């Protein structure tokens, strides 16, 4: 089996996907613009061959690379990066080289937030009031329905990038004076907490691994206010969230992929609203958190499914609450690293520096903490972030 891994070096922890594929007997073909010598040794050892291009955004270079791989290794069976950024590129390459997976005719409904909304509504799933707006006049019509505050986000975008919270008409006018020339979705601001329905499906689209995350704060607020965030896996997925998550799975026909679905749980009603879908693993160190929460290896599980051997952990369970805790270097904290490890060293599974691309949301340094008790991980998170 031949697997083309786009940008296998990033995010840094995703090299483990390539290692797991090799361990399953798959031929792993790396494709990126990174210098080969800068790849970590474990990734080099996992790759059968690495093809370096001058620019990953030059589609013709990518086509030549896949042509080279096809000539030397035969039919290409899969291509992926596990990155939102390359979803469209992957889909185009799959279409042009007849590789199974998401194709170009499917990409809009998993990239455009407006198309996601349409799918949610068609499936009978509640969403925040809002729509694509053309101009200020159109936006003011929407305000009559929703009131302020509003959230403005690009129809195509990742995370909280280029997202704004608008409190009144002056800010709304300023937004239209300065917004980029792309479609923007305006929605009512929902007071609530983000929760997720995550997992992986087998080749038939059946979910074989499930997880849910809860966040201490919204990612948008964290980025806009330069705040701190922690988030944690749950040991049990709430029934209403799982029921809704499974409906979203059916609506989007997810096969042989990780998925990361985001919802709001409203403060006043406790009800759920669908926010967006992501056809990739949750970001940051979350895949490692899955491992620590369940004492399994999700990299191996994914590779086993790709290799046609099925999900290897049918009896898995969430043994721990597992929490990611971020710290930013522009803070004066109450506790230094030595004090953190003295207090919670028995619960800290992992800690590392975070790539600058993610630091605005996740912090410059991250700790992963686990315990069978939720109170323990929240207490540790608050201790680590105390200022």
Located regions from the model:
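Conserved ATP-binding module of the ATP-grasp superfamily
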Residues: 126-128, 145, 149-152, 161-196, ...
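ATP-binding N-terminal substructure of ATP-dependent carboxylate-amine bond-forming enzymes
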Residues: 1-105, 311, 372-387
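Conserved protein kinase catalytic/activation segment
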Residues: 270-272
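Short acidic-hydrophobic, aromatic-tinged amphipathic segments that line or gate anion-handling sites
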Residues: 50-57, 131-135, 164-167
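A conserved helix-loop-beta module that forms one wall/lid of the active-site cleft
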Residues: 95-162
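ATP-dependent carboxylate/phosphate-activation module, predominantly the ATP-grasp catalytic core
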Residues: 188-254, 258, 267-268, 278-306, ...
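Peripheral (often C-terminal) accessory segments that flank ATP-dependent C-N-forming ligase machineries
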Residues: 301-387
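Short beta-strand-to-turn element immediately C-terminal to the catalytic PLP-Schiff-base lysine
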Residues: 133, 163-168, 200-202, 231-232, ...
């Amino acid at each position: 089996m031949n697997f083309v891994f786009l940008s296998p070096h990033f995010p840094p922890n995703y090299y483990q996907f390539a290692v797991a594929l090799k361990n399953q007997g798959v031929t792993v073909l790396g494709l990126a613009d990174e210098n080969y010598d800068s790849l970590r040794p474990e990734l080099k050892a996992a790759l059968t061959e690495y093809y370096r291009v001058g620019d990953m955004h030059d589609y013709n270079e990518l086509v030549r690379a896949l042509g080279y791989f096809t000539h030397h290794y035969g039919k290409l069976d899969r291509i992926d990066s596990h990155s939102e950024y390359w979803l469209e590129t992957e889909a185009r390459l799959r279409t042009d080289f007849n590789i199974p997976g998401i194709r170009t005719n499917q990409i809009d409904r998993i990239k455009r937030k407006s198309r996601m909304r349409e799918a949610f509504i068609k499936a009978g799933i509640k969403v925040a009031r809002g729509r694509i707006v053309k101009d200020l006049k159109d936006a003011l019509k929407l305000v009559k329905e929703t009131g302020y505050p509003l959230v403005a986000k690009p129809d195509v975008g990742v995370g909280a990038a280029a997202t704004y919270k608008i409190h009144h008409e002056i800010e709304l006018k300023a937004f239209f004076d300065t917004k980029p020339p792309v479609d923007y979705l305006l929605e009512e601001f929902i007071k609530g907490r983000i929760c997720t329905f995550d997992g992986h499906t087998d080749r038939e689209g059946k979910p074989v691994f499930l997880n849910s995350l809860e966040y201490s704060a919204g990612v948008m607020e964290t980025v806009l206010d330069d705040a701190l965030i922690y988030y944690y896996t749950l040991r049990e997925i709430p029934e209403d969230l799982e029921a809704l998550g499974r409906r979203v799975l059916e609506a989007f026909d997810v096969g042989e992929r990780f998925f990361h679905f985001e919802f709001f749980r409203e403060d006043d009603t406790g009800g759920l609203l669908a926010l967006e879908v992501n056809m990739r693993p949750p970001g940051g160190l979350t895949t490692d958190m899955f491992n620590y929460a369940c004492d399994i290896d999700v990299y191996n599980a994914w590779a086993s499914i790709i290799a046609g051997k099925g999900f290897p952990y049918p009896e898995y369970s969430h043994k721990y609450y597992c929490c990611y805790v971020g710290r930013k270097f522009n803070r004066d904290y109450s506790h230094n690293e030595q004090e953190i490890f003295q207090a919670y060293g028995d619960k800290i599974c992992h800690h590392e520096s975070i790539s600058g691309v993610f630091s605005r949301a996740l912090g410059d340094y991250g700790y992963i903490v686990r315990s069978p008790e939720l109170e323990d991980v929240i207490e540790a998170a608050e201790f680590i972030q105390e200022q």
